[in-house]
Amino acid sequence: MYMIQSGMKMLNNNKVQHVYLIGSKSLGAYGGYETFVYKLTEYHQNNPTIKYHVACKANGEGYMDESKLDNAVKISENEFIFHNALCYKIHIPQIGPAQAIYYDVAALNACCNDIKHNNISHPIVYIMACRIGPFARFFYHKIHKLGGKVFLNPDGHEWMRAKWSA
């Protein structure tokens, strides 16, 4: 189980909204979710009332290489700050197509552990793709029990759209 290591403490009061971004592989040019996260954190980087926590893929296709980002500050082997967001890397075993599910589950575990360990009040967990399938209910319940809210990108439910129905 991965634990966010930085120990980076913030004022944990109602003035700071902690937002955990799950589902993008990196920040930047890999794809749509990655570009969304890059632009979102860039736009809010000087806003002291929002603190982003971004899960990034540590290895494999589309992995996060923070050395390619201007002004990224390395905290540890698995963490760095970029656009004032705490980015944490999730190591993924090479297990074929199941990597995406493993990555999201590991990222959500790290997110929940960080919320609990740092006593984060009213966190928001934004999931960019619905790849967790049967694990969704477990994490929704766990995050709600920790006082958080879960937001799911509707594109993660592409298969549910009427245009694909038989």
Report each predicted region and the residues it spans.
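Membrane-proximal helix-turn-helix segments that form the acceptor-binding/catalytic region
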Residues: 166
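A generic structural motif
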Residues: 47-53, 120-121, 147-148
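N-terminal strand-loop element at the rim of the active site
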Residues: 16, 21-30, 43-98
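Glycine-rich phosphate-binding loop signature in dinucleotide/nucleotide-binding domains
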Residues: 114-122
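Conserved alpha-helical elements of sugar-nucleotide-dependent glycosyltransferases
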Residues: 32-40, 103
